[in-house]
């Protein structure tokens, strides 16, 4: 019997993460993005510093002790452009004071007109890229928060160098 010849093209998807890993990355990305739009990272409210008129509380989150730690964590989830959008160099939402990470206590909270979300991984066969599709219920407060529709958001999850990261992202709630 003939020996099969090795193929010169790798099997499509061989190095791509499983759906479960992508969904776990989406959950981490949603949490991290929320630190900027919904509520800050967990805080130690007993350790406060005032800078100008602004009161900051020390961040109390395992593994993220400095601004560099936070930036590194965000870069494990998002493209450089998205990280810069969240954490600009001259930003004031998260600051480092005496070698520790601090942030402003407060946030907008989640959107009460948004309900349950459904998350799917879509693959179109393009190597190194997939889409995370999030469908979220739209609720009407005037109708007892009943579901009156839905919104769909697509986020690209792509291989950039050795990393798999989101290159598009926003909050859905």
Predicted regions and their residues:
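Short beta-strand edge/turn micro-motifs at domain boundaries
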Residues: 129-133, 143, 150-173
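Surface-exposed, charged secondary-structure patches
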Residues: 93-140
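Ser/Thr-rich, Proline-interspersed low-complexity disordered segments
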Residues: 1-13
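Generic marker of residues within folded, mature protein domains
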Residues: 122, 145-147
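Core segments of small alpha/beta cavity-forming domains
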Residues: 14-104
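Phenylalanine-focused residue identity feature
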Residues: 8, 36, 78, 145, ...
